[in-house]
Structures are given as structure tokens and as C-alpha cells.
């Protein structure tokens, strides 16, 4: 029952992460047939496969091999717990990663041990945030994107065009509405755009095919879609003024060459602003680390007991079998009334239980 992790961490360059992009459900289904237990955690900044076994359930492309992280045993547990608590995020303590770990546990986790591990990770993530208040301030990537805009221009009254109405896009819109921006939104599925309109009446809906017309007249353009290709191409942007482009997508949705004529920020650029806000949360780290170490001990105790669970069950069943056999032999050799037989049976079971219990506790102590 060897616990392992293989994947790409948050420090992996975007162009490498793009080479290891996949549909979670299809990828998860393909791995399930290759190993007894597996879990897939995919976010904007990481691609991680947790599994039980000695052999990696996938072939690593030589291009991404230099960036691969591999962990085993307690290091896997500590890594996931740090991830769920937001200690391994671009934004220290950010809440979105906890939702992503929870999603993995619910939809992309297979096997008793990994289910237990991810359940503990989700529980710990909630405990860490509740006890320390590390997420008191909204420091998600979407929030940092808006703060980045505020450092460049006064948002109030400015035309800001948001492409994509998923979770990230919705958060951006929420922050922009509170700052009085003139917001335009577009989504390939127009129905979803109207759903956002119900949530934020201030927004204006743009047909996806008309997006370039509005891009050219915008002060800021934010892309937050799940498209596997460029949604904004440099040659189609017709504007003499400097437009601030922010690409919150993975893979990237805004053609990189656009920065030759305009201002472009990607997920990597947000790291600089995140450092400023991380200082507000640094004091909480030691408390969370203590919570992590306590939870690691709890999980490892459970994990180690699983290795001897079958042995313990065997001993208990064998003891019951031997007691039954001895009572059967005794009842045939000695004529006893029912009451006497019950008393002997009770005493024999009690004695056996104490002996078995002693040995089981000894085994547990040795393992733990």
C-alpha cells in the first residue's frame, strides 16, 4: 500500500502546463483501470496524480520530465495538506484551492486510502481557515487581477470587457461591480451570459461574435474561459490606445504577441502582487503548520493500522473459533448443566478476549 504522488507543481511554467492539459473525467477514467487507487487534482497551476502502488500509472513525456515532482509516503500527505490549507498556492491561504481539492475528492478520487486522505485534507483546510482567519481578506486570483487593474487606472466608469462567465469570471465581475466599472460580458454560450445578467443587472451582454468590436473600445479586457485555444488574437484587435489585457485562462486565451502593442498580464504576472498580500498572512503560517502536523499524525495512525487490519481480524476470528471448539470438546467429555456450561463459556471467552486484546494492542503499538 505505497502512497505516491507524481505531477507538475505550481512553479511549473505555463507553456509546460499547457502540454499536459487534459479532460479530468476522461483522464481519471483511464487511470482507474491501471491502478487500485487514484486521485486527480487539476488546477490552473498544478497537475497532480495521487496513487497507491509501485508503478506510475502513466508515461511521462520527456519534455515535461524536468518539471515533474515525485513524492511518496508521509511527504505525499504533507504536500496535499499544505495544498488544501493554501500554503502551496500563489496566493497564501486562498480559498479556491480548497474547493478544487473538495471537487477532486467528490469526482476524481478512487480507493479507500485516497478517499480518507482527501477527506482529511478537506476537513483540515476548513479547520485551518476557521481557526486562523487566513482567508479573512478576499485574495483569490480574480481579486488580485482587479487590484492589478486598480494600480494602473481608476476603475470607476471605465469600460471593462470580461470574456468568460465561469467561476473565475463571475468573481471578477463581482469585484468590478462594487467598484463602479462599466462592465461588458461575453460567453460562447449566450444563455450563461444572461444568467450572469440576472445576478448582476449592471452588466451589458455582448454577442461572442461581436467581441472584437468591444475589445477595441475597452479600457480593460479580461479573459477567463476554458477554451483550449486563443480567444483573443493580436491581429484582430484594432485600437490605437493602450488596452490592459489580463489572461486568467489556462491554457492561455490571449495571444502573447498582443503585448507588443498593449499591456498584457498572465497568471504568472499575478505572482508579484500576491507577494504583497501574502505578508498579511505570514503570521498565520506557524499555526497552520502545527494543525497540519497534528492531522498528519492522525492520518498516519489510521494508515498504518490498515496494514495490519487483516491480521487483527484473523486473530479475532481464530480466537472465537478456538473458544467454540474447546467448549464443544468440553461438553462432550464432561456432563454439565446449561448454567455451568454458560459460566465456563463466559469465563473462557473473557480470558481469550483479554489475551487477544493484549496481542492486538501490542501489534498496534509496534506499527504506530
Swiss-Prot record:
Catalyzes the NADPH-dependent reduction of glutamyl-tRNA(Glu) to glutamate 1-semialdehyde (GSA). The active site is at 44 (nucleophile). NADP(+) binds at residues 164-169. Substrate binds at residues 43-46, 89, 94-96, 100. Keywords: NADP, Oxidoreductase, Porphyrin biosynthesis. Possesses an unusual extended V-shaped dimeric structure with each monomer consisting of three distinct domains arranged along a curved 'spinal' alpha-helix. The N-terminal catalytic domain specifically recognizes the glutamate moiety of the substrate. The second domain is the NADPH-binding domain, and the third C-terminal domain is responsible for dimerization. It catalyses: (S)-4-amino-5-oxopentanoate + tRNA(Glu) + NADP(+) = L-glutamyl-tRNA(Glu) + NADPH + H(+). The record marks 79 as: Important for activity. Homodimer. During catalysis, the active site Cys acts as a nucleophile attacking the alpha-carbonyl group of tRNA-bound glutamate with the formation of a thioester intermediate between enzyme and glutamate, and the concomitant release of tRNA(Glu). The thioester intermediate is finally reduced by direct hydride transfer from NADPH, to form the product GSA. Pfam families: GlutR_dimer, GlutR_N, Shikimate_DH. This is Glutamyl-tRNA reductase. Belongs to the glutamyl-tRNA reductase family. It comes from Thermosipho melanesiensis (strain DSM 12029 / CIP 104789 / BI429). Disulfide bonds: none annotated. Pathway: Porphyrin-containing compound metabolism; protoporphyrin-IX biosynthesis; 5-aminolevulinate from L-glutamyl-tRNA(Glu): step 1/2. Gene3D superfamilies: Glutamyl-tRNA reductase, N-terminal domain, NAD(P)-binding Rossmann-like Domain. Coiled coil: none annotated.
